[in-house]
């Protein structure tokens, strides 16, 4: 039986700088596929022997590629990966993808690609990996209609739409079956012009373990879908989840999320600088996270924080910059009873909280494992006094530079004359 022929028409920005396929795709499929360049055949085994320069020289005017035997292929990962001068790909809308398992990095870093077919009517029922599929397609202004893709077997969607900087709307992926997806890290990261997301409120995240950076740098989105009912009980990483969602006016009510297995909550709300309030996350179980650094960093419009005074901090080792640059806060929750006995880094904790009128009584914090307190109270310009921190054990601290820098309203300092400074090697700007 004659091999099936799939013809792809491609256009390049610079004819002299042709890179046809990603090396991983070639390596995976060299025995299954023959490429025909305008009637000149070259099997994939020969392709990987030839240098890019040789191919450019031999086929500098190529506009059409025919792939013979595409229906046999199970892996198209990196197929067009790093084809940085590729402008257009056509005739792929009805590809026979019945056997394909892996679509990882299919169009990854096709930075000049401006056009894909309106709809990709592909059978994706066997695909398990869609990660990095459109990663850094920075010239694409729209994506194909992929709303009907079968995603039941997909386990990895990480970085799928990452850095699609010009996309203003996504296909309606609200009905995608995500019950087996494990990794959604950076799924929509860097979609800077995206104005809204499809209604992904009913996505099933029961098996997801990583949703970190998922909405990171979605600068233009004002409201997110109601993701309050997502089951994230297996998730271990939510770091930078809403990082730099700098146009968000409110967040869904995520107060009842089960975050008990999360290990990393760093920078979750960082640079959400238009939010004036957060959901009531006071009952979040943070007994497992080791990292809460910069969690609320530069939430500069926040008028108050949820009452996080009862959070179990016993396993946390990083809270540096946690409240830094929350410039509108005039007070903080009573965090005086936090158990920070395992914390090693609290640098810049209250840095640039320029409207704070007072601090909780943190005089009894166990500082025995802390090695950095630099910049902790820096630029707290409205404080007239500090808690009595004279009895803090800072015997393991090496860096206290800029500790009280620019605390311009302070009338006096606690008596820190008896601090054990034997390990300190940085005190400039204290």
Please report, for each region that a protein language model flagged, where it lies by residue.
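Short, solvent-exposed linear patches
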Residues: 68-77, 94-105, 121-132, 148-159, ...
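Leucine-biased recognition of intrinsically disordered, low-complexity hydrophobic segments
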Residues: 166, 195, 205, 213, ...
């Amino acid at each position: 039986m004659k091999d099936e022929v799939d013809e792809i028409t491609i256009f390049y920005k610079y004819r002299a700088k042709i890179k046809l396929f990603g090396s991983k795709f070639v390596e995976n499929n060299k025995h299954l596929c023959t490429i025909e360049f305008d009637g000149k055949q070259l099997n994939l085994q020969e392709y990987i022997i030839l240098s890019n320069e040789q191919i450019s020289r031999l086929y500098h005017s190529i506009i059409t590629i025919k792939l013979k035997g595409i229906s046999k292929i199970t892996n198209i990962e990196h197929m067009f990966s790093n084809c940085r001068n590729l402008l257009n790909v056509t005739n792929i809308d009805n590809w026979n993808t019945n056997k394909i398992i892996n679509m990882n990095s299919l169009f990854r870093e096709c930075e000049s690609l401006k056009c894909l077919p309106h709809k990709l009517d592909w059978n994706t029922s066997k695909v398990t990996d869609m990660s990095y599929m459109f990663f850094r397609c920075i010239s694409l202004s729209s994506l194909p209609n992929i709303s009907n893709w079968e995603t039941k077997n997909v386990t990895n969607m990480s970085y799928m739409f990452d850095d699609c900087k010009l996309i203003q709307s996504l296909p309606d992926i609200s009905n995608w079956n995500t019950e087996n997806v494990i990794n959604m890290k950076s799924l929509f990261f860097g979609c800077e012009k995206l104005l809204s997301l499809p209604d992904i409120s009913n996505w099933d995240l029961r098996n997801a373990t990583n949703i970190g950076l998922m909405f990171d740098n979605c600068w233009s989105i004002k409201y997110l879908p109601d993701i309050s009912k997502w089951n994230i009980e297996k998730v271990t990483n939510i770091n930078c989840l809403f990082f730099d969602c700098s146009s968000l006016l409110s967040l869904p009510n995520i107060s009842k999320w089960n975050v008990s297995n999360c290990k990393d909550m760093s920078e979750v709300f960082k640079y959400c600088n238009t939010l004036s309030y957060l959901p009531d996350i006071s009952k979040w179980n943070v007994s497992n996270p080791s990292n809460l650094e910069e969690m609320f960093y530069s939430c500069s419009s926040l008028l108050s924080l949820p009452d996080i005074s009862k959070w179990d901090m016993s396993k946390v080792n990083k809270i540096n910059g946690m409240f830094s640059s929350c410039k509108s806060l005039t007070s903080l929750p009573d965090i005086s009873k936090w158990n920070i006995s395992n914390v090693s880094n609290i640098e810049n904790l209250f840095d640039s909280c320029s409207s704070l009128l007072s601090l909780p009584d943190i005089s009894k914090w166990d500082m025995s494992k802390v090695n950095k307190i630099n910049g902790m109270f820096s630029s707290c310009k409205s404080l007239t006094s500090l808690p009595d921190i004279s009895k803090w054990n800072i015997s393991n601290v090496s860096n206290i530079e800029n500790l009280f820098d620019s605390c311009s309203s302070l009338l006096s300092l606690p008596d820190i004359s008896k601090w054990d400074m034997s390990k300190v090697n940085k005190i400039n700007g204290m």
